[in-house]
Amino acid sequence: MAWWSTPYFTTFMENKTYDEKNLRRLQLVELEILKDFIALCEKHKLPYFATGGTAIGALRHQGFIPWDDDIDVCMLRKDYDKFMKIAPEEMGDKYIFMSTDTEKRYPLMFGKMVKKGTRFIEDAYQQGNYPLGIYIDIFPYDRTSEDEKLRKKHQKKTWFWARLQVLTLIPNPNLPPDVTGWKKKAAEWGCKILHVLFKLFHITTQMCTNKYLKWATHCEDDSDLYIDYSYITGENLMIRTRDSFPTVNYQFEDTEVALVKDFDAFLRPEYGDYMQMPPEDERHNHYASFIDFGDGETGN
């Protein structure tokens, strides 16, 4: 497999474990962020739905998966864009809303709602020169083609421009742990050289963002199929609007979170039998090397 087609420069899941007290404190801060996110969505009638471990946690545990350390929610692009415009105006005193529009040093194609005054430094993003606080992820879903060949073309184009965007900002991004030896050295040098060349030829972050959005938001057919182009296996987590909305609320800790109507069709292609607990060596998290909870206490 060519290195450009692998999930470089993304978060690589860890098997490290937190101190139990710190993990629970982290989850409770994230839960606070989620509640504020939901309140704003409900106020402005913006649909959203949980994905990944957050959705599985609601179904299997009625809250966080015991070892999980993040929250993931999704919105259709039009609702995502509206949220990212409204949110800084209404909650900017408490949160930073990071996207490629609001934070020019931010290298990712999805949003983060970050609690001000906190720090959450993942190994994968230590090189990032942007606010690294406790957050929830917000993924935009874009309309995509019913034609598999055309859809895969758009996936390749968006993935390519997303990787280039990272290299306009970070010369030494984290590489997957299974890349070792001469391949790792070659990839490291390749990243540094490309970073320099981009500066010389004025290939900017905004240019890469525009190219990404051109491919992500342009769908030739009148489809009700939607995909998260920022996720490498996004095709496994596609939704159809007719099978997804209106969403249904499920218990999550002391609140409720929205899931797509046909959550099984949504989750099973990516996660298989998600109601079964995975073996211990497959219980991954994002693991932060440093956490500041914003109240003077730190941990990891």
What is each PLM-predicted segment?
Residues A2-T6:
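Conserved oxyanion/phosphate-binding beta-strand-loop segments in alpha/beta enzyme cores
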Residues T10, E14-E42, A87-E146, V166-N300:
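Conserved catalytic core of two-metal-ion nucleotidyltransferases
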Residues I38-I71, M75-D81, R242, K261, ...:
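Active-site nucleotide-donor binding segment shared across nucleotidyl transfer reactions
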Residues F83-K85:
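Conserved SAM-binding loop
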Residues E148-K153:
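A short secondary-structure junction signal
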Residues Q155-W159:
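Short, His- and charge-rich active-site/binding loops that engage polyanionic ligands
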Residues W161-R163:
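Mobile amphipathic helical/loop "lid" adjacent to a hydrophobic cofactor/ligand pocket
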